[in-house]
């Protein structure tokens, strides 16, 4: 199977897993060893500004976007105490991985310090935890019709409200989510 890195997974309505129901996941990695991604539409109920304050990081230069309530996301059920920042490419920080399409994933504290300063990435998401799949696990879930896939785009990542991302991702395929059957079958 071709790599789905830099794609979105859209949960099918039939996916009744309590964590993954109605999720959109950005796939950061996908290869023969497995896959890793971040859920981009499940806020934790913590504002990024509050997280920075809890970590004793500077907030005096926090952008207007943060002041208006940018949310920390529940990135997935794995390592929920570990932070990830998905952001537009800027080569300033340690522990950054270039993902393609002008995106980077950074796991170091210095990017959070930058978010509270004038060196913030242009656009970013902060998530705790990630979604992970072992070898062939994601491929099996795709064969089981648990997920739809579309190429990732910056607008869905950064410009659409969290609560609208699942619907908007479905619309990008040319239909509304309610039009999807909750059951898979054979013709």
Swiss-Prot record:
Top-rank taxon: Bacteria
Entry-linked Gene3D superfamilies: VC0467-like, VC0467-like domains
Bilayer-spanning residue ranges: none
One GO cellular component term noted in the UniProt record for this chain: cytosol
Pfam families assigned to the protein according to its UniProt record, in alphabetical order: DUF179
Sequence similarity: Belongs to the UPF0301 (AlgH) family.
PANTHER family in the cross-refs: UNCHARACTERIZED PROTEIN YQGE (PTHR30327), UPF0301 PROTEIN YQGE (PTHR30327:SF1)
NCBIfam families linked to this entry: PRK00228.1-1
Cross-referenced HAMAP family: UPF0301 (MF_00758)
Protein name stated in the entry: UPF0301 protein SO_3346
